[in-house]
Regions:
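Active-site pocket-lining/capping segments in soluble small-molecule metabolic enzymes
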Residues: 1-101, 109-252
Length: 252
């Protein structure tokens, strides 16, 4: 927080440079890349010079860390100015057309995060090329084929700009309260297990019995800003055998 380029969720607050360095170091020392989610759909050329976004991009450019991109103007800027970053195509693009997806898979991306509406359409998934380049979003919180999803992403992007100005703007902007706005969506109050009833939900059994045998190997858990209990449950569900979950819950 509060990077203006951030998308998908509105991240508020502020963070010190020392803490950013600490987080990057802790992940990278274990061989784990950090992945910036620079997918704000409202980014224009005027936002490319944002000092905070360029600072955090510069200090993490080491060939290991990654960036998720959505808007071409920012993608081109990153490719030109920070060429060591592997880039990932965002699910925010909402690519449901097969021909458009095939074209996306041929581009120079490390991964393409599949639109969740492709999930569990096994006959079609079987025929897709470059399965090792596709990442599956396994627990989408959004309603399948939601007609307001694009507007919701734009609303969150606008809110991100407002929070960025409050932290980094001039004195007048910093003192100006952020207008109270809401995007009414019942899914915002869902917990992890509410999402398991969606047709787009991918269970651990499906991962191992369907997706992996097909050749898929990249899976993404949604919910980075959910309640810690929800995040914990999603990790338990996908990464811990059922007989060990209660024991680990107590230890964590």
């Amino acid at each position: 927080p509060p990077a203006a380029w951030n998308g998908g969720r509105t991240v508020t607050g502020a963070v010190r440079r020392e803490f950013i360095d600490f987080i990057i170091r802790q992940y990278n020392s274990r061989g784990i890349p950090i992945r910036y989610t620079f997918t704000n759909p409202l980014i224009k050329e005027i936002h490319l010079t944002d000092p905070f976004c360029n600072m955090i991009t510069r200090i993490a450019e080491n060939g290991l860390n990654e960036i998720i991109v959505n808007v071409p103007v920012l993608e081109d800027y990153i490719r030109k100015n920070y060429p060591r970053y592997p880039l990932i195509s965002s699910t925010v693009k909402q690519i449901e057309d097969r021909d458009a997806l095939l074209a996306e898979l041929e581009k120079d991306y490390k991964l393409v995060v599949l639109d969740y509406n492709w999930n569990n359409r096994f006959d079609e998934l079987e025929t897709l090329p470059h399965k090792d380049k596709i990442e599956i979003l396994v627990n989408p919180y959004c309603t399948p084929h939601c007609k307001r999803r694009k507007k919701h992403y734009e609303f969150l992007g606008e809110r991100q700009f407002e929070h960025n100005l409050q932290v980094f703007g001039n004195e007048k902007q910093a003192l100006k309260p952020i207008p109270k706005k809401e995007f009414p969506c019942p899914n915002m109050s869902f917990d992890f297990y509410d999402t398991t009833g969606f047709e787009t939900h991918v269970s651990p059994q499906q991962i191992y019995e369907k997706y992996v045998p097909m050749g898929y190997e990249n899976f993404k858990i949604e919910g980075r800003l959910m309640h810690p209990a929800d995040i914990l449950e999603s990790y338990m569900y996908y990464m811990v055998k059922p007989e060990y979950r209660d024991m680990l819950r107590l230890k964590m």
